[in-house]
A protein has these predicted regions:
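Multi-pass alpha-helical transporter architecture, strongest
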Residues: 82-89, 166-192
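A late C-terminal transmembrane helix in Major Facilitator Superfamily
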Residues: 48, 119-156
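C-terminal transmembrane helical hairpin of 12-TM major facilitator-type secondary transporters
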Residues: 67-114
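A membrane-interface helix-boundary motif in multi-pass transporters
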Residues: 29, 69-72, 151-168
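Interfacial helix-cap and linker-helix signal at transmembrane-aqueous boundaries
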Residues: 22-23, 54-55, 59, 149-157
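Cytoplasmic loop-to-transmembrane helix junctions
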Residues: 32, 66-69, 126-133
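Extracytoplasmic gate region of multi-pass secondary transporters
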Residues: 1-51, 107, 111-115
Length: 192
């Protein structure tokens, strides 16, 4: 639940703050926002599809168990989330859009993999509760970050806040690796 709590602020930031960010920080008018603001969501759709294929691909190519392949996929997506963390470092609004697209793709890939881990790690009669708890934690994280973003965007700007988004997913991946390590070891010992 903690990795999802740290990942969800990215999606809520993308969903609710991109147009305001593009207008205030990047000086885009409504016509330019309409031309570009949809792109991170298309990239997110592709990330959602990729999330379903990446772990079986990793398992097949590298010969690792499915749960380990999902965790590796989460790690790869978390590394890609560094891109939106660097938005404040680029001068061009078009590069900012590219970084938002990478972030949308990475977040949805990561989100699919974290949700799927609930089914991999819990008995069938507990999956719904586990996934509900993970989703609740995610939305709490998103709510808290949205409150902070609304409070601090005018004083510190969006750049540092986007930076936190990149760091949050890396921290979440490390926490996931730490807590799921024993489950992966037990699964691999059982299958050996």
């Amino acid at each position: 639940a903690i990795p999802r709590m740290l990942a969800e602020p990215a999606w809520q930031t993308f969903s609710f703050w991109i147009p305001l960010y593009l207008a205030k920080e990047r000086g885009m008018d409504i016509a330019h926002i309409a031309l570009f603001a949809w792109m991170p969501f298309l990239a997110a759709d592709l990330g959602g599809l990729c999330g379903g294929y990446v772990s079986p691909f990793i398992a097949r190519v590298f010969g690792v168990q499915l749960v380990r392949s999902r965790v590796i996929g989460v790690g790869l997506a978390a590394v890609l989330m560094i891109a939106p963390g660097c938005i404040g470092l680029v001068a061009s609004p078009y590069w900012a859009i590219v970084f938002l697209c990478i972030g949308g793709f990475a977040h949805q890939t990561l989100s699919v993999l974290i949700n799927t881990l609930s089914a991999d790690c819990y008995p069938a009669d507990e999956v719904g509760v586990a996934n509900g708890f993970v989703s609740q934690a995610g939305w709490i994280g998103g709510l808290l970050f949205s409150l902070a973003l609304g409070q601090f965007a005018d004083t510190v700007g969006y750049g540092p806040l986007f930076g936190f988004l990149g760091v949050f997913d890396l921290i979440g991946a490390v926490i996931l690796f730490t807590f799921i390590r024993h489950l992966i070891a037990a699964q691999e010992a059982r299958d050996a």
